[in-house]
Amino acid sequence: MIRFISDLTVLFHAMAGRKKSAMGTTQFINQKMLQEAPIFSKKKIDNSEFKPQHPLTHLVVANNFIVMALANKTLKRRDLEDPTSKEEEIDLKKTIMRTSAKISKLFLDPTGNHLLIAVKSALENDNPALYYLHKTWTQPRQLFKFDKILITAVGWNHAQMDALDIKKTGPILIGTTVGKILETELNAEEGFLGNAFGMTNQVETDPKELYKIEKGQSNQDEKVTGLQYFLSKLNSQKYFITVTTPTRLYQFIGTVPRSDTRPLLAPVFNKYLRGSEYVRPLSELPPSSRKSSSLSFFFNQEKREYNQILNPEKIGWMSELFLFWGGIQANNDDRTVIDPQNRRSIPFEVSGSEDDIPRQAFITEFHALILYKNKLRGICLLNDQEIFVDQHDGTLVGMAQDQMKNIFWVYTEYSVFKYQVSNEGRHVWRIYLDQEKFLEAERLAQMHAHDQPEALDIVRIRQAEKLYSDGKYIESAMTYAKTKTSFEEVTLKFVDLEDKTALKNYLKKKLENLKPSEATQSTLVIMWLIEIHQNQLGTMRQCGKNSDDQKKMYQSEEKEFFLLLSLPQVEKCIKENKEVVYNLLGSHGDMRSLVHLAEILNDTERVIRYNLANKQFDKVLELLASAGDQRLVYTHCHALLSSDPARTVDRLMTMDRVDPLKLIPAFMNVTQSNPEVVPHCVR
């Protein structure tokens, strides 16, 4: 009896396994980054592009449109999208800037069309003010309905970004120093509400207070430091709103039955005002930690389609003590949009020095840029690893993000630097791999296959190893089959397992991937598969097929084996090694499979011999009649006449192409040895 498995086991145990690298992920990534272009490439804006004569106090950028505020109460702006455009300068001293007033903050919408200028005074008796400057205007206009209100955050209408009317903002949210959230709309068109209301040239609608954030732990009003709202791409009536204060991060989720409702977002906040939903912060800091707070989002702009809603994929909130980030779920959960399985906090080192207090942070898909007094840090969100530190000689005034272009701008009083994100996920697959997040690792490895062709194989090998160690042998085998791991190394892992299903599945998958030129290995794999199937069928036969379940299991295994034999690649191999396969099947006593194989190979003579041995003469006669090979008739006529003369002669008389002269030897031999046959032969 042939036993391929035993022989191959000895062979594979004699082969040496591969050596694995001991290099850690962090060490590997750091070495690679020294050789490659940086993830965040830095460029200082040339003096020909930017020539500040006075200190720079504020800078905002959106859709390649940059606006800068200078200490001499002027604005500079330029359309970076148009290389022929020139820098515009707007003098604010005559229009909005009193002697004691200064710009508190600039707010530019993601399209770059709408700019809000918050102004405050150093004098206690002077009220704050808010001004609006459209991209097409040369002077800002005061929004009188926001007198005495110092705004600290703006939630722009992202659903308006693809609107053809660039002079309307749609509903926007306004956050204030005392924790109020207001809603208004801006319209740059002349005569917005018309003379009928006595408010010609009014730009803003009446601001409506929708909500007030509760006081902090020290019983003081909490100013709104970050504010954004989004319409769900899955539900055209569902909105989610994110609000941050110096110590808290909130989310509000609700539906708006009609998009023409004004104020639009009142229904979302109303359910929290009624108490039907309890507002509790997602994250909270002790009351002493109140110096820094910034909110940011990551949008995958590559997925943006015209006139289609693009929701952010990640949220980031920076406080003095930590950076919180989370993935945003695209589902219909009314409790949270932040994925509880994909969120974490990255703590900051607390030294007490002002130099070490983070001032601003923006997140990308996998990283965060954190601004300090005189340095910019880049860290990986997935493992907290610091990827760079950019030290600056002067004090860094601030940082801005161009959300549409995924570009970051850092500025001092007299310098501006641009940081461009480039291929930031190039090594992230290794981080996911170390965290055993194989689906994410495989997705990113596939994305970077052009510059890291080995990545996908590394991921799959590690996944296969993990599945094997967890006892998931079939899944492990199928994963190994997708790798370039040597055939010997993989089979060595599975050959000693009592259940050969995993090995069988691996061999089948391996067979699918073998090239026609690899005939020797194909033959080895096919023979091994036949042996495994035969062992499994033999074990089932020995255990019996008494119950229905046993019968079904046997039939299923046999069907799977017959399917293997019918594959063109297998059939070709068997034809070239026919006797070996017949002997193998015969050694297991599996005549059904042997006959089935002979039928597949059109090996009629072998089938005839099998049926003669089992006295199935009718089947033999049918085969002879249908085969059309008269040689087989002459060869087996003697045996048939001896065993069943009547039916044999009946069938012979129907075969027109049989030569009677060639039947005479068989007839004479039979009649001489058995005279009882004569009446059937002479008619």
Predicted features by range, described:
Residues 1-14:
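N-terminal amphipathic/basic-hydrophobic helices that include classical n-h-c signal peptides
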Residues 12, 16-365, 371, 375-400, ...:
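WD40-like beta-propeller blades
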Residues 252-262, 267-587, 591-598, 604-683:
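Extended non-globular scaffold/tether segments
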